[in-house]
Amino acid sequence: MHTSIQRIQQTFSQASTVLSIIAAIVFVVSYIQLVVANVWSLPEANFNLRGSKAARRFSRQYGANDPKKGKENVALKFDLDADLSPLFNWNTKLVFAYLTATYDGKRDDIVNEITIWDQIITDKDDSHIKLKGANSKYSLYDVEESFRNRNATVKLHWNIQPHVGAKIYGSLDATKGSIKFPQLV
């Protein structure tokens, strides 16, 4: 006959195995639902740049290594319209959406990407993003001294954080999704 400790250990071992199998099934089924909904080819996000303004900031908080020299920072004003409701199913805990601008670096082999705005969406009812005249959430600055009138391409990225399973990533192209960074005046 087995002791009480061995019986308890066997029960917990079997329960954890069954729960692991159920968790794997939940993740696979919810992933299949996302594939069927074709979430990796959602319609484009409508992005419209309303304005941009460059300024020189003299704080380490704004990226300046030498507070006396300062660093060029850019603030953007934009409109954004995107429907992320197909990303939600019964296993979705939240969707993290963020808008990025990608531009060439000093050398040809360098591509820079900066985050303009982000939002955590916890409910399917709030998943249609409609922003009018929104300001960039973060101070935009480059490791170099200036953006030097560079052009940037805008994309809306998302990642799904499920209740069970691994994160799922994707992105949407933005219509009119380009920015010409202004010159510092």
From Swiss-Prot:
Chief location: endoplasmic reticulum
Sugar-modified residues? N151
Q: Which chain regions cross the lipid bilayer? A: 17-37
Record-level GO cellular component terms: signal peptidase complex
Q: Which domain of life is it from?
A: Eukaryota
Q: Which residues lie on this side of the membrane: Lumenal?
A: 38-185
What ranges does the Cytoplasmic topological domain annotation cover? Answer: 1-16
Q: Where in the cell is it found?
A: Endoplasmic reticulum membrane
Indicate how the chain sits in the lipid bilayer. Answer: Single-pass type II membrane protein
A GO BP annotation:
protein targeting to ER
The protein's UniProt keywords, in alphabetical order, are: Endoplasmic reticulum, Glycoprotein, Membrane, Signal-anchor, Transmembrane, Transmembrane helix
Chain's role = Essential component of the signal peptidase complex (SPC) which catalyzes the cleavage of N-terminal signal sequences from nascent proteins as they are translocated into the lumen of the endoplasmic reticulum. Essential for the SPC catalytic activity, possibly by stabilizing and positioning the active center of the complex close to the lumenal surface. Essential for viability.
Q: Assembly state and interactors?
A: Component of the signal peptidase complex (SPC) composed of a catalytic subunit SEC11 and three accessory subunits SPC1, SPC2 and SPC3. The complex induces a local thinning of the ER membrane which is used to measure the length of the signal peptide (SP) h-region of protein substrates. This ensures the selectivity of the complex towards h-regions shorter than 18-20 amino acids. SPC associates with the translocon complex.
The family assignment reads: Belongs to the SPCS3 family.
Protein name, per record: Signal peptidase complex subunit 3
UniProt lists the gene as SPC3
